[in-house]
């Protein structure tokens, strides 16, 4: 059968041009004339509805669709704007929403257009492009009143005002082109009326006869008769058949009115096979024609030939593929449509022609050479032409003609696809000069040479599409049947994702025990396996047939960009190819095995949670890293057979597998879904939270991660059920520690030295990876690879560590620091391990050096996706051993108690030559004591000690001793645990950290600390203290507890590891058996906590005894008056900035002097405690004016026992009687300070510093009680008011004068009527302690400020706080610089007031501020003016004759109070010194303020 060449080609061209109009329904031609319109019934597009049509135009502008609510708010318009569709609509007068298509529609091609309304949303679909837009309206529904208009608006609507809701629509030009197949909600609307619109000419009856297809070309109807068996203008003429071979002339060749179409439906497993062996083909020119209709993207349509002589016609990714090889190389052609794909479920016609042509060649000889030109056209429009190579021009085939598929499509030579066709094929015809094979017809008629495989329906039926599925989570997967591809096979599929990692396909075979050369080595399991995985966006093929693994990167570009990719894997024996979007990559498997034995099921998208029985080869990294695939998969074919994975997923009820595929915009992280500072990244339609640095777990980092506390003896050990072999690991954890050393995590093996270990090493994180090459008979290993990152990580803060290994590549990340990277140098990349251990390495058999145990906290350990700490703690795994403490616990490791100051232990020499990291914890109540000492060569040594409650670190590297004082707010002997870290780096940067406070200093010179001999801990032998370096203050050892001792990464046991032990050193730390309580001491006595009990400081109570409840030493002063005088030795007269006085008494006198303290003759400083008009009053003068403080709210001359407490600091004072509120006195500012400030402005600049220093010294002197000489008790002196009554328990600045009088102290004399009552009380320690009784001076509390104190009251509900004003000596103040070498060392005579605990719920002391100007004072000043002048002259005379030696302060007597200085040595800021404005008798002395 052949066409008339005059009409045939023309009709085919035209017929194919309009083939898509078949079954499109009525069509309309819009001429584009002025006033053109077409009116249809109202489309109620309020809620959910759809409208669709096909269009063809070449105009760049025009109105397509319009309707509205007739002038109110709502409208919708669809225009052509610049060749693209523009959709614009509004609801409820909202701002109109607009969307533009990307597809150009003015290309004179047919385009399918759909409008979908869904309340506020409207979707525009142009061919395969989908765009949607939402209007920001307060109402959901669209109101429609008008008709549906196409192509234009009637003139009457344009002329009437307010009839059109969209004012701009009347200016739009009419549409010019074709519209067909109009549907509204699935049905064809009725045309109400039109103007300027032509109906389809082809609708008239009998335009084309015998089933010819009518179309309009140049406004004329044209008939396509190609499928009718007729020809002519109206398909009425009979087609002439040319006779051929008898065996091909089948069926009726005569006339017929209607020609039957031969078609068949293929569903993926069916195919036709025509046997050519009886009559092989041998041709130089031939033609193949067929029509197809499908929704599938890939599939074989026709194939004939084998080896290097074949023709292959297939659908490949929606395009038509032709491959021809005549023996000298393949000619390949790929025809793709301009828009969309050919798998659009519409009929498409394919024609392939091959003709022999003669071409002139230029060369040695002018020879005409023959070439074969090949032309392929689809739908008569898309044509590709090429030439086969010159040497071979004949197609010869004695094989088979395959139609719709084959038994093994992947094995066909030149086949670009591996799966069979799914859809409809009709009129498949091959013909050459000699033969015409109507293959579709032969199959239906059952020709004996034609074999039909499968159940084929010889009509076109709908073929179920292979719907895509989406794997929504890494845990989702589908199980497929076992893939039997022992010798050869193929798998193809499409996928799309934006995620970088995931296991797409995996299957393995039966385990094969491997024989090891070393009989001691365990047997390992070897399996055949097949996998396709994604890592870092790249696609990999992995294959092992038993003789070695091949790993092939399918394509060099990354394939996680969200686009569809077609993957086709084909294998034949040891070789094969994997292609991605036609980019083919070959591979060759190593070894000799050609059989792939896969015994297990094939897993798609991931692996099951229960993996018992599964064996993961080390080469499949995604399986071991637990990277499941997240994304879409479609069109899966195995050996050419389709797999409906949607139905399979539904049948398996696969969790997390959705039967569709849509790509959402990457906006998942915009709402900040990751809580607790988790890091968010966009995944495939999901967000992915990185919680590794947060301390939380869960999809959104919403769940607290378990914290484990390690004290050096605790661990967590994961004992895996089977030995693991990996080539890739992901490890992350958080830790917090104060030690510079300790193992964080390690993998260990029972059979080798393999390990991946994370540990702290000198404050840095160290990663060690050791792959034991020796046992596995590979290239000898060069030793473990080591990488460091971070510094000073032992700061007791949380730090995050991440490790990523991929084969030989290592990456270590700490917090947000720059990653440290490394490479494994050996050939071996496999890590073997049985255990994952934390805290302690218990599998030590093959370790040359065991890392130090960990002390600190771990959280969030994740190893290859497994959160082992929480899995173990929650009981989700039963192969873990855990004894670490759960939760955040305060860690005290291996505590040891030094029971006495003479106890100590010795350890081997401290190794600190280049650098040093020491850590320990201590708890004590002792203010002083030697903690560590190690001597060295020459002058080298190191000492750590407590001095008055503060830590001192002393060292000498050969350049002289250097002292660093630790920084702490309060003394450290408070019976609480304190953490101490001392380090020295290679640059001589010394660091001392106490709890959270850090002190650093760099020393110059020598950098090496060369120690030798034993390391003493807790003290040294008694006879060694005198030989300690000068900067070492300790004279006794440390009494208290030490714990968590870390000596440069070594954790010694202070008992079992000790070389020697002296005194009582016991394990554990119980602390004091008796502790201070609120009521431990009576009468406001201060409780002093000591290691073996407590004692009471009764100084300011007037009482005595162990608990301050015994009467103090009491004297009765008779009616004739008595006097007790204490006189300081001439060289021991103190000068004080602060004073403390307490005494108890009973009397009935209204006026009397109780106590008076005087300075040396001529100075005039004094302090006097007296009763005036029945009230207690104190008057003192320290170089300014007399300052008074008085308690007027209570009379004390009632014969009852009263206690008076007085303190002074400079010019400030406090007074308390009994339990009354404390009265505070703050004098007003000194007027002379203002005068001096004015004078300072006139002092030359060069003398400014000198004057300032002098003024500062004068200011200090104005607050000092100078050169105290006597303490007089009883007031029996000439002109005074003697006291009559009882005085008890007198205390003044550490002196208990009444006790001293009773004991006959030579510095005390008793005169007149003063008689001792009762026995002298004593102040001793509680029964649990062993402190001796007090002597003449207060010896019970020489360092009260270094001890935790509790003040007790003998009355409920009344608690008074003793003022913090302290004793100071002007010429011997405590240094305030931390770098000072000699600390302040007050003598036993200076008693400091101890710090008190916070008073809660008690009233604040009453503060009384006296006025500096009263009427009485003014009158007194006026009356005494003349007397003041005489006194002033006398004072000046005394000054000129005064010896400077009278201002000498004996520095050997130090009355400085520790509590008067800040913990770092700075003096407490004093309150301003005030002097009344109207001064009384001024003392014009040089120590005052005259310049």
From Swiss-Prot:
Residues 1437-1491 are cytoplasmic. Coiled coil: none annotated. GO terms for molecular function: metal ion binding. GO terms for biological process: cell adhesion; sprouting angiogenesis. Residues 198-236, 665-702, 1072-1109 form the EGF-like domain. Disulfide bonds join 202-214, 208-223, 225-235, 424-460, 632-661, 669-680, 674-689, 691-701, 1041-1069, 1076-1087, 1081-1096, 1098-1108. Residues 1-27 form the signal peptide. Residues 1354-1364 have a biased composition (Polar residues). The chain crosses the membrane at residues 1416-1436. Residues 28-1415 are extracellular. It is a single-pass type I membrane protein. It is found in: Membrane. Ca(2+) binds at residues 309, 326, 394. Keywords: Calcium, Cell adhesion, Disulfide bond, EGF-like domain, Membrane, Metal-binding, Repeat, Signal, Transmembrane, Transmembrane helix. Pfam families: EGF, Laminin_G_2. GO terms for cellular component: membrane. Residues 28-208, 263-460, 467-661, 707-880, 894-1069, 1113-1314 form the Laminin G-like domain. CDD domains: EGF_CA, LamG. Belongs to the neurexin family. This is Neurexin-1a. It comes from Danio rerio.
